[in-house]
Amino acid sequence: MRKVYLAIALGFCCQGIQAQQSSYRWKVEAEAGVSCSVLDTDVSGLSETYYKVRPGFTAAIGAEYNIVDQLAVGAGIRFVQRDYLYQNLGGDSWNTRYNNNFISIPLHLGYYLLHNPYHEKGLWIKPQVGVYYEYFTSMHTKGMYPMNIMEGYKGDGSYIRYNTTYDFRKNENHLRRSLFGGEAGIKVGYSLGRLDGSIGYNFQYGFSHIYQDKASTSKTARRNSSVITAGIAYKLF
């Protein structure tokens, strides 16, 4: 009889532990990876002019809440480099490398497939969509241009090389610092209980025109990025 009581007690304990494990609602996560960005603008009227993708670094921390069933909402803070290369390959070719740094605040909604890591261990897949606000913290440019593109210049067409940091206090190009965008992506991960590991892909599309006065140019100019990350998460309660 004692063995029966002991078995029942152990059963209740196991159920209690399982219930406790399935009660997770919050998790914090950290991730880092590579961003590949380009300036999305119309250069069809400019002969042999291109904007090309350049890789950058991204890192983020955030929190996520399991709202109901498989649905979760998350937010965080993220650093992302949106770098790209401008090239003119005409007779007097020149180029500029743009290193653009942003701090952004993303908000996303995701849906877990296969397994819900808040309730069970195993492989999970999470498609997600969201929006973000970002602040343009700094821009560094490096490149060269031919002297003969300067008005009134007469000479041998030699090049000027430059390596500068943009002065946002003067903001001579009237760049917009507060920007908004949308993103969509997918994460694949594995839950070990409290700990999750994951890899993810996100496409980030800029809603905001990069200049303060869009009327000053008829061309659309936005920064778009593809981001690949690896991350870990820890469930709190």
Give the location of each predicted region.
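Bacterial Sec-dependent N-terminal signal peptides
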Residues: 1-27, 228-237
